Amino acid sequence: MKQIQPVSIWYNGQIYQATIFNLVSAFDNLVDTCFFTYYLYDNAQFQLTTGSLTLTGADYTTYSSSPDSNSYAYQWGATQLNLTLV
């Protein structure tokens, strides 16, 4: 889990501030594709939203050869979702 700059999320008729980003590898074929599931939580770790991301191509090559693939994946996922890690 990573802290993010607050993002407004509409949930069940109210606006909440997501401040936590979690990214989980759901599948990696270890060749050219990785699927992630992401979650956004508020400060109380209440899940506000979830979704999926697919990492392929040059991004996958960089991810799979990175000495810190977890950090790369979080930064890549945050960029895809227009989130800012703190």
Segments from the language model and where they lie:
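Negatively charged, low-complexity tracts enriched in Asp/Glu with abundant Ser/Thr
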Residues: 1-28
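Acidic, low-complexity intrinsically disordered segments
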Residues: 2-4, 9, 48-86
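Compositionally biased, intrinsically disordered low-complexity regions enriched in proline and serine
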Residues: 12, 17, 22, 39-42, ...
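A short, structured beta-strand/loop element
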Residues: 30-59
